[in-house]
């Protein structure tokens, strides 16, 4: 069995992580976008990749099923983070967590008047902390997708979601009204593995750090 297991998710994060893997001398032997394999061998016999859902990456690392992983800050904020070390902001998969409402909705007045808003999001912990810090009382509705639909069918007054270009909001007649925080992907490491496998993991951390884009 390979000494090091790295948990990744398909899609943008995997694609953006390839330069970091290459910097560490790691070349995947299969393309997860076309292969059905969940365990991807690499050119290094001591390193393998496991492909999991983005929201599951921290769990695999926390419980030691993977030694390292790459996960978005949004995912990590919703996870309890026990047993995880977050040494690097890789500055990839960048976007913003925003509050958005339908066009024409006067969010500022609703906040000023102390209205109790219904907010749809899959980022319940983060949204709760954000609105509590503003002294706002909200009813949070947990959704897992198609967030933009919620204000259009009166399920919610607002949504909290990730926004990259804003194109999806515009296409659905929504507008971003408040930024909660910038989001990017982080390298995470199992704390026990960092101690027990340090001679192998430390060079990976150094290679990843050297590959972080400058001036981003």
Curated annotation (Swiss-Prot):
CDD domains reported in the protein's UniProt record: PBP2_HisGs (cd13595)
Instruction: Tell me which EC number(s) this protein carries.
Output: 2.4.2.17
Q: Enumerate the Gene Ontology biological process terms.
A: L-histidine biosynthetic process
GO cellular component terms attached to this protein's record:
cytoplasm
Task: Note the Pfam families from the entry.
Answer: HisG
Q: Which PROSITE patterns match?
A: ATP_P_PHORIBOSYLTR
Q: Which reaction does it catalyse?
A: 1-(5-phospho-beta-D-ribosyl)-ATP + diphosphate = 5-phospho-alpha-D-ribose 1-diphosphate + ATP
Under Gene Ontology molecular function, one entry of this record is: ATP phosphoribosyltransferase activity
Q: Which cysteines are joined by disulfide bonds?
A: none
Its EC top class is transferase
Q: Where in the cell is it found?
A: Cytoplasm
Give the matching Gene3D superfamilies: Periplasmic binding protein-like II
Q: What is its main location?
A: cytoplasm
Which pathway, metabolic or otherwise, does it act in?
Answer: Amino-acid biosynthesis; L-histidine biosynthesis; L-histidine from 5-phospho-alpha-D-ribose 1-diphosphate: step 1/9
* Domain of life the protein comes from: Bacteria
Keyword list (alphabetical) reads: Amino-acid biosynthesis, ATP-binding, Cytoplasm, Glycosyltransferase, Histidine biosynthesis, Nucleotide-binding, Transferase
- Which ranges of the sequence are coiled-coil? none
Q: What does this protein's UniProt record list under function?
A: Catalyzes the condensation of ATP and 5-phosphoribose 1-diphosphate to form N'-(5'-phosphoribosyl)-ATP (PR-ATP). Has a crucial role in the pathway because the rate of histidine biosynthesis seems to be controlled primarily by regulation of HisG enzymatic activity.
User: Quaternary arrangement and interactors, per the entry?
Assistant: Heteromultimer composed of HisG and HisZ subunits.
Family of this protein: Belongs to the ATP phosphoribosyltransferase family. Short subfamily.
Domain-level remarks: Lacks the C-terminal regulatory region which is replaced by HisZ.
| The name this protein goes by in its record | ATP phosphoribosyltransferase
In which organism is this protein found? Answer: Nitrosomonas eutropha (strain DSM 101675 / C91 / Nm57)
Q: Which gene encodes it?
A: hisG
